């Protein structure tokens, strides 16, 4: 991915949740002619600020980020849309003589960007509406069984309670007559969002990308960061933020926005499903699981450059790696 020195440089700053990626990206932007592009599936939504650890408006004015606050929570934002938007913004950045710096931890977005999405069809609102109407009549277990009949490979990988993925698999089949697993095979893609590095090439991401991963050295330190950050979110008013979303009346837990880690647990708490203490436990546990998945994925990334979140000279360490990469590139 990064061995072609003729390609323009880009920086991919990844890492598990609560590792400090955003702060590092902003610090780097003080030293580099770069444009910040968010790679976060929750920060895309307006009104979902506290629970996504979104920088506040004053910070965003000082350090502008692309792909933040671009969707209403009722509107899905797909990995395909992210890829299109990110590639467009990266091209604009390079054309302006700057460096695109992508920062965030959403695995499926990086997968789409680096591996591509093949010829899988885009979402179709009419077909989705038909599937949702059927689900209301017969239930999602029946639709999962329907999926098993037309695409047993996908059905075996998709949990019967995962409504979004059942819907997408049926949608693809109805639009194309081909099972979703056909596209997985054609792409060399893994349905569990693990990257197949044999299929990553410059055609998918035509950049000389420097891969940076930020994380604490010790897992228990990351867990402590996660717990502390969620407590701070609660103190900042996350419960009120979620209550405002509930009061709208057009949002529900089936939407990708509301299913986001932290938001889903606070929403359920406000619905009376459990008490505050259990909500905190469930939210922090879900966030730890997210971080574990992110770390597992990052360990498989080739040419990864690890940075310690505990390093007192973190910015300098990152700048050394970036400077080395820029020196190896052709001039912009």
Swiss-Prot record:
Gene3D superfamilies reported for this sequence: 1.10.20.140, P-loop containing nucleotide triphosphate hydrolases
EC number assigned by the record: 2.5.1.75
GO biological process terms held by the UniProt record: tRNA modification
Interaction with substrate tRNA, as annotated region: 40-43, 164-168
Binding site for ATP: 15-22
Site (Interaction with substrate tRNA): 106, 128
Binding site for substrate: 17-22
UniProt enzyme class: transferase
Catalytic activity reported: adenosine(37) in tRNA + dimethylallyl diphosphate = N(6)-dimethylallyladenosine(37) in tRNA + diphosphate
Stretch forming the signal peptide: none
SUPFAM superfamilies reported in the protein's UniProt record: P-loop containing nucleoside triphosphate hydrolases
Domain of life, per lineage: Bacteria
Annotated keywords: ATP-binding, Magnesium, Nucleotide-binding, Transferase, tRNA processing
Cofactor(s) the protein needs: Mg(2+)
GO molecular function, one term: tRNA dimethylallyltransferase activity
Pfam families: IPPT
Known partners and oligomeric status: Monomer.
PANTHER family given in the database record: TRNA DIMETHYLALLYLTRANSFERASE
Protein family per UniProt: Belongs to the IPP transferase family.
Database matches in NCBIfam families: miaA (TIGR00174)
Role this protein plays: Catalyzes the transfer of a dimethylallyl group onto the adenine at position 37 in tRNAs that read codons beginning with uridine, leading to the formation of N6-(dimethylallyl)adenosine (i(6)A).
Name by which UniProt lists this protein: tRNA dimethylallyltransferase 2
